[in-house]
Amino acid sequence: MNFWNNFAAKHPAAAKWVREGGLFVIVSNLITVFKYLLLQFLPKAFASLPVVDFGWPGIDITLFGETFKWNILGYDAAHGGLPYFCAYMIAMVIGECINFPIQRNFVFRSKGNLAKQIGWYVLAFCVITCIVNSINCIWMAVAGLFVPAFIYNIGTVVLNGGISMVIFFFVNKIIFPEGAQAK
């Protein structure tokens, strides 16, 4: 502890980045595990929905002999379609609803304007989700050829969590300034 206290006293800005970064990674990884657990049962909860292509823009792509629809948002029927998309989005939204207050209040210690922070966080979530999903639909199609669903779901949440974590750290640094709200 003495080393850390000395480091923090000599380099307060660096110590803040290390503390926030470390806590951010821990919280984000715990949320990622939680999302993975949700994806183990949520697709079954939507099994009664029709398994139809549900995505945009739905461009046909062939990789490793597997033809699938590339989507920025959603999945083709062969890779879960509407039921998987519903399960995936619910897992992501629940995870972020838990993540937001922990990151805001505990990790970044922000007291900023809550409504603005929620708005920016939701916007960032939507943009990041589109980026990640456009990569994830390729991952699911290719990984689905080689491994069972519980394995590619690990890849799905690690991909989602990893890319999201990197982007969200910098987004959160901006939208969650530490300290009291400016008047």
Predicted regions and their residues:
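Alpha-helical membrane-protein topology signature
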Residues: 1-183
